[in-house]
Amino acid sequence: MTILAWIKDKKNKAILNTPEYSSQSSLSWCFTHKEAASNKAVSFINLSKRRALWTRCEKCGMIQFMRFFKENANLCLSCSYHHIMTSDERIALLVEKGTWYPLNETISPKDPIKFTDTQSYAQRIQSTQEKLGMQDAVQTGTGLINGIPFAIGIMDFRFMGGSMGSVVGEKLTRLIEYATKQGLFLLIVSASGGARMQEGIYSLMQMAKISAALNVYQNEANLLYISLCTSPTTGGVTASFAMLGDIIFSEPEAIIGFAGRRVIQQTLQQELPEDFQTSESLLHHGLIDAIVPRCFLVNAISEVASIFAYAPSKYKKLGNISHYHENTLSWATEEILRRNCINNKKVEYRTIEKIYQTTLYKESFFRLNKLLSKLKSEINFTNKMKKQNNAFNTSSVYANYYDVMLCNYNIGTHSLNLLFNEESEFCKYFPFNMDHMKKENRIKYNFITENSNDFIRKKTINDFSIMLIGD
């Protein structure tokens, strides 16, 4: 007897000796196991972890090997149809290896209106986060594109259809503010179904918040914002930041629109063109600037940025951010305030404002003391050089302070009085008094009077933004 025959014989004996097989007929045994299999829950987690070896093109239907498909940047090897990419794949495609630095990774969405459909919004968020390993539908960070530094935001359609909620809006707004402060070019890759209905008015508010941040970035800082619309880009994303770019690129055959094709067709009761809401149709009507295939995206983006960066100065308008302010609180404190505002409806508005002002007061003085020590060292160095050389020009040092910003922080009136008190330690080292500085227009006051329901960015009338400006 061969080894294979011996193994087969042992298997047959083991099957025949099982109690359920020996006591039942073959037909009854089949029916019993069929019912048990139907009642047994399917393990979707195990199925989702299995990697497919083959994939089918959504346009031409060609079956292709998954590894070759991924190496070709999710392009069909037959018809070059652009399939949806994940945010990680998009980062690997656009950003130089080793230069990606993520921002605001830890911000996670909450359930502000306790929304429930087939399951609660909180459960849906948790399951999606565990499945994808992401906190929300956008990744933000900085990186190099052909050697040019960019602030980059990339949306991921896998996370609840790339819908824009409070976290997506907050991360993009912080990214834009960071790019404004650092003077970086901005690239946002859109892939979204629109505003997230599970968050109600909180999601709709993000459209205005992102657009307001872009207004400062584009019209005051005069920096370059490139918008890349991928398939699909619809709803509130299209109605806000996706169409506000200085340059708007799109991938071939991308679906870009506001309402869905089926909704419009049912409303108008007439047939729509085949190319309706496609990037080719939008290019024909002038809504986008260029359709760029995926393989040329990096070169196209870097070329536009190079033209903008290296243009002669007479063709460029220098930006002046008159009322820009950076986040006054650390991200951890902001996150605590945000969650208290959204989740705890019992917390009163005055309580949140008091917490904000108290924390602001502490952090402002910490930063001012740090700045004060820096100014002390500068003045001591200047006095030392003046003793050694009487011809040493101290006025330029005093006037410019190496472009040090005294306060790009919002400081309350009480903090101002303590800071600029004649007996304060700061004024002992400061070379000019306040009246002299005002006459030379070296200090500008920008009163922030707007009231915002976004508690993190709430400012009071007593807040100032003071900046020491040189010649």
Curated annotation (Swiss-Prot):
GO cellular component annotations of the record: acetyl-CoA carboxylase complex; plastid
Superkingdom field: Eukaryota
Keywords: ATP-binding, Fatty acid biosynthesis, Fatty acid metabolism, Lipid biosynthesis, Lipid metabolism, Metal-binding, Nucleotide-binding, Plastid, Transferase, Zinc, Zinc-finger
Pathway: Lipid metabolism; malonyl-CoA biosynthesis; malonyl-CoA from acetyl-CoA: step 1/1
InterPro entries assigned: AcCoA_carboxyl_beta (IPR034733), Acetyl_CoA_COase_Trfase_b_su (IPR000438), ClpP/crotonase-like_dom_sf (IPR029045), COA_CT_N (IPR011762)
The keyword Transferase is assigned to this record: yes
PROSITE patterns in the record: COA_CT_NTER
GO molecular function, one term: carboxyl- or carbamoyltransferase activity
Pfam family name, one: Carboxyl_trans
Cofactor note: Binds 1 zinc ion per subunit.
HAMAP family with a match to the protein in the record: AcetylCoA_CT_beta (MF_01395)
Protein's name according to its UniProt entry: Acetyl-coenzyme A carboxylase carboxyl transferase subunit beta
Species of the source: Helicosporidium sp. subsp. Simulium jonesii (Green alga)
